[in-house]
């Protein structure tokens, strides 16, 4: 893939983003799920979640705790990477994935190898508040080490983390994730302006013509999650969104990328 651009060229189809990889066919946020995304023609980007281990390594994991998606238990922040690697991160999905382990961001970057862009969601932890800039800084170090700077965007519900990312790397592309509880009634332009973001990311239920028009007028791209059916994808394409996040990107790619869309 060439350098990341927040919007597809005028007249082109919206970006298709594999949400936590092809998480409908393989356990989310694993190398298996990301590998499937890389092998599926028509997918543009992978979305993944990152947080820190106890030894300050960047690991790819959605939840604060381990038990939903691995044989581990308790807060991920209490374990080192080597300790996490002891846990089975695939059997919960299907026994055939028992060999899957919680990957590090470095492992994912090496696997994807610029075949797809990445949307790295920065996760914050209320119970383990990070020293300002710790996760953001470690992510940037890894991305720079593997020369992925031009192939990635960063998103977060924690908009302070996005502001920190911009401070550490002014050229970083960021996306504000919309939280109903916190941001209800606020328009994309205002949320993005506060942290200098280029992308507005929200759930499908939050999308309206008013929201899309406001984002457009502010020059923002609009990405929507989580669209797992052709019906939902069709509605968002009609609204003019720029990116579609899906657990089943492999199943809707034929529609999203069909000629004429």
Locations of regions flagged by a protein language model:
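Phosphate-group recognition and catalysis centered on beta-loop-alpha active-site segments
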Residues: 1-261
